[in-house]
Amino acid sequence: MCSISQLAARIGLLCAMVLPSICSAGPTAIVIHGGAGTIEREKMSAEVEARYRKTLAEAVSAGHRVLARGGRSQDAVIAAIVVMEDSPLFNAGRGAVFTNEGEVELDASIMLGEDLNAGAVTGVKKVRNPILLAERIMSNSPHVMLMGEGAEAFAKTQQLELVDNEYFHTERRRRQLEHVIARDQDLAAIEPVTDAYESRKFGTVGAVALDQQGNIAAATSTGGMTNKRFGRIGDSPIIGAGTYADNNACGISATGHGEYFIR
C-alpha cells in the first residue's frame, strides 16, 4: 500500500482516502474531504498547496491510526475532523467563515451506521471543536440536535473546551467577508478570483469510516456560508442532508450548496 502522502497526492488536494486494508477482524477504510470542488493549479501557489496536502494527510492519518488499532469508526472520523477543525485552512473550527455580524458560527454532526444514532449542533460560537460536542450530544443526551447558547451550556457540562470567538478568526476570512459585503452579494455569486475563489472552493470538512467490526460512521463540520444572516442553517448539521450512515447502505458527508441538499 502507498503512503498517506502519496495517496493524497494521487487523488487530489481536496479529498484524501485510505484505501481499504484487510485485517483479521475485517476490512477498514476512511475517506475525508476538505470542501467541494477542485482548484486549478495556476490559481494556487506551491506553498499553499503543500499546506493543504500536509493537513489533509495529518487528518486522514489520525483517523487511520484509530482503525488500525481496532478502534471504532466513530472515533476515527472524529479524530480526522478535529485535525481539520484545528487548522486555519478550512471552513470549520478555527479559520471558519464570518457571518454578516462579523462572528463565527459553527455546525457539526455525526451519525452511526450500526444503530442510526446521531448527534448534531448548530450555531455555536465558543466550542473549540464542534464535532466533539456533536458526539457528546449523541452519546450523553436524549437529544439529536442542540443549538446556540443551550448547546454551549451542555458543552460545559461535558468539560469540552470553550474559547473566545476571536480564536476562530483569521485575516483571510475577514477580507473575504469585507469583499462580499462590498459587493452586496453572498459568496456563491462571486467570480473566481483571489481569496474569493479560494473560499468558494475550500470549506466544509467531513469524514466517513468503516471499522473492523463492519460499522460505518460519518461526520461533518462547517462554518457555513460567508456573510450568512438571520440564523441561516445549512445541511451540515442536518441528519439525512449533510451527514448519513447506515451499515446496510453507506456513509455520506456532504459538501456544497446546503439548501439543495436539504430540499
Regions found by a protein language model. Give the residues of each.
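N-terminal secretory signal peptides that target proteins for export/translocation
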Residues: 1-9
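Bacterial N-terminal signal peptides
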Residues: 10-21
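Alpha/propeptide regions of enzymes that mature by internal proteolysis
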Residues: 25-263
